[in-house]
Amino acid sequence: MQPRRLAQPAAADVPAYAIEITPAWTNRMKANAMAKGEVVWRWGEEELVMLPQRALWRPAGRQLLVADLHLGKAELFHAHGIPLPSDGDQASFDRLINLCDRLNPEEVIVLGDLIHGRLGLTPALHQRLRSLPEACGCAISLIGGNHDRGSDLEGLPHQPSQRLGALWLSHEPEPQPSSPLLNICGHVHPVARLRQGSDGLRLPCFAFHASDQQLLIPAFGELTGGHECGQRYRKWLVADNAIVPWLDPLSHSPSRRLAR
């Protein structure tokens, strides 16, 4: 039996060589992903798994991609006399370590903004970051983000945007419309707004822009806010510990193009 396929955009909306929204996975892979609330997605030969923990898994190289942890944000605000809940960092650390325990990655790649700023980089946070590779059981790489600038993170030098297989990894969006690469980035903190009458709900999401060949991944941190993605993006919501493919009826009807 062939696996059920999600609705796909018209062929004219996507690069012909690049995108397959739902891969032909085996029944076992499909069942495992569905049981865990995950979505398996393809870009050419690259298989990617969207995780409800707001992370992206690349099985081929066993890389776990996260972005925008903004560690130390509460402490930075406290330094300016603004109270914020201070347990967000612990929740982010716990979620990351639990993911590593389950997936056993070869590498965790942080797509920028590991910390929120130098003032929030306390001695305790310094120590947590020094011990993070051991806690995760793998190497940690950091593509430097705007909030990481000027910080001295021992063992975590800032790396530039870089290629990984058919992927272009960056912190800020770096569209790849004239290449076969998919830009995976953070920085935006993508969210989707759901409306029902006068009620509204904002949920973190993965967001794909076809003509920019770009996949935005949600902020991994707890105190991060979000930027609402427009109708040109195809979205996968993070809700109730599951990834939920969502089609905006205004932007994904058969008569409307997915992207610019």
What is each of the regions a protein language model found here?
Residues 2-7, 11:
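Short linear segments in intrinsically disordered or otherwise low-structure-confidence regions
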